[in-house]
Amino acid sequence: YHAIAYFSKLETPPTAFYCANDILAIGMLKYLAQSKNWYYHPSIISSDNIVESQYTTPMLTTVSLPKAEMAHLAIQILTDRMNGGHKAIVKTELQSTLIIRQSVRQYISTENEPEYYI
């Protein structure tokens, strides 16, 4: 909530945000809904796909993560390490799903806009 308040007041605010989780993104959407700046509508995307993300305005675009599989692998690796195995870093790739809703819009470039890396 406070981050978007700060960024929205910049002379050239970011056009998009990726939030670590849906709760943070919902806070950003809440700020934008309550804001007096009717012309600032950045794209917002996050990770989790919690139920509440379907009921925001606009509905939140999110990445659905395989939470059960992530938990199973974490427990398996932890158990192996406790038993003396898995001493090296473990790299695992899991399938995720992008749930496209209404919080992301097409980007239209303008002249002289700065690049942001947040």
Go through each PLM region and give its residues.
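Flexible loop/turn connectors
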Residues: 1, 5-117
